Structures are given as structure tokens and as C-alpha cells.
């Protein structure tokens, strides 16, 4: 994917405020501090398209970006940060389920996991929603430069078992080395333009 132009469109919290039009959308989801901002910035060749917050999880907004005038990149709010107020945590579930169930031009969701962490309940819930609403997931495991090859293999097995997928469905990524960037774009293009014949992580 050659990135020619990326522009912020708007932020929203409810369907009435989502951008108009029928451009296909690819959304990015993951717990706070999972490396979502770094992944997006590397994929679109920008240093600060998505800024890393000093107070993770406090901003509960869905952010929409136009990419090449061809599709929309959607940055979903992070989840799972312990110090977020309870009221904010309660908003996350309904906001996510509404977007996933009602956004007809949503083609797929990049579910981002940290190679050093066991997936949390919200990760499992997100994957459940994607399956329930027939949204194709692409599982990306970040921060792979922070562990050894042996530790990566062990952690990958734990992650796959926890969320109920095959290890081969994991896409490994490092913001430092850019490992996985091309593979992830191939997966995204497949979902956007129909090359993918079946949902990643679909239950057999």
C-alpha cells in the first residue's frame, strides 16, 4: 500500500456523528498501552498522526482518518487501563458494540495485542463481537522486539490459546524494526478489496 495522503476527518461517539459516505473502513482496537498509536503511525508513514496519550484510556472517542481518498482508518478508544474512571469504562462497551454492529461500511478490525501480555477479558469480548457481527479480524501482536525468539514463541502460544485462534493467524509487529508492516498491509488490502476469502479467527 502506497500512502499518498492521510487526513483527520472527525471524532465521534455515536452513529449520528459518524462521517457520511460509503468509503470502506478498517478500525484499530486494543487495550491502552498496547502500541496502537505506534502501529498506526508506522503503517501510514507518519510520526504523529495518532498521538500517544500521557493518560491512557481517558479519551473515549472514535477517530476517523481518510487514507488516499480511498478508505477510512478508524482509531477506536483503548480499553483496560486501571486508572480510568468507572463512568468512562462503562461507556466503552456500548460505544464499541454500537459501532461494530451498525457501521455497514466497516470491513475489518485490527485487534492489537502486546506480545508480553496475556489477553484480557476485553480482548476476548472484542473478538466475540467481531465474530457475532461478521466483521473480519486481523490479529496483530506488537512490541515483538522486546522479547527473545523463544519468548515470542511461548507467548504467541499463550495468546492464541487464550483467544481461541491458531498461532498462524497472528501477525507479528515491531514499531522499532518495522517488522510485519508489509504483511499487515497485505491483510488490510485483502479485507478492503475482497482478496480474503474467510474471516481470520473464525470459529470452525
Swiss-Prot record:
Q: Name one GO molecular function term.
A: GTP binding
* InterPro entries, A to Z: G_ENGB_dom, GTP-bd, GTP-bd_ribosome_bio_YsxC, P-loop_NTPase, Small_GTP-bd
Q: Which cofactor does it need?
A: Mg(2+)
Q: Which residues bind GTP?
A: 30-37, 57-61, 75-78, 142-145, 173-175
Q: Which residues form the signal peptide?
A: none
One Pfam family of this chain:
MMR_HSR1
Q: Which family does it belong to?
A: Belongs to the TRAFAC class TrmE-Era-EngA-EngB-Septin-like GTPase superfamily. EngB GTPase family.
- Protein name per its UniProtKB record: Probable GTP-binding protein EngB
Please report the organism this UniProt entry assigns to the protein.
Answer: Geotalea uraniireducens (strain Rf4)
- Supply the gene name: engB
Amino acid at each position: 500500500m502506497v500512502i499518498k495522503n492521510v487526513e483527520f476527518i472527525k471524532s465521534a461517539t455515536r452513529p449520528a456523528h459518524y462521517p457520511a459516505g460509503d468509503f470502506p473502513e478498517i478500525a484499530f482496537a486494543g487495550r491502552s498501552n498496547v502500541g496502537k498509536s505506534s502501529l498506526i503511525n508506522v503503517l501510514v508513514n507518519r510520526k504523529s498522526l495518532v498521538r500517544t496519550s500521557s493518560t491512557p484510556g481517558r479519551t473515549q472517542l472514535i477517530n476517523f482518518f481518510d487514507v488516499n481518498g480511498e478508505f477510512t482508518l478508524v482509531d477506536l478508544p483503548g480499553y483496560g487501563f486501571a486508572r480510568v474512571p468507572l463512568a468512562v469504562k462503562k461507556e466503552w462497551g456500548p460505544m464499541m458494540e454500537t459501532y461494530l454492529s451498525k457501521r455497514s461500511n466497516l470491513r475489518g478490525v485490527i485487534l492489537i495485542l502486546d506480545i508480553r501480555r496475556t489477553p484480557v477479558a476485553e480482548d476476548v469480548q472484542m473478538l466475540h463481537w467481531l465474530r457475532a457481527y461478521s466483521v473480519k479480524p486481523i490479529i496483530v501482536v506488537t512490541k515483538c522486539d522486546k522479547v527473545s525468539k523463544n519468548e515470542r514463541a511461548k507467548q504467541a502460544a499463550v495468546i492464541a490459546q487464550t483467544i481461541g485462534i491458531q498461532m498462524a493467524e497472528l501477525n507479528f509487529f515491531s514499531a522499532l524494526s518495522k517488522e510485519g508492516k508489509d504483511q499487515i498491509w497485505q491483510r488490510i488490502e485483502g479485507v478492503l478489496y475482497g482478496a480474503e476469502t474467510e474471516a481470520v479467527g473464525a470459529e470452525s
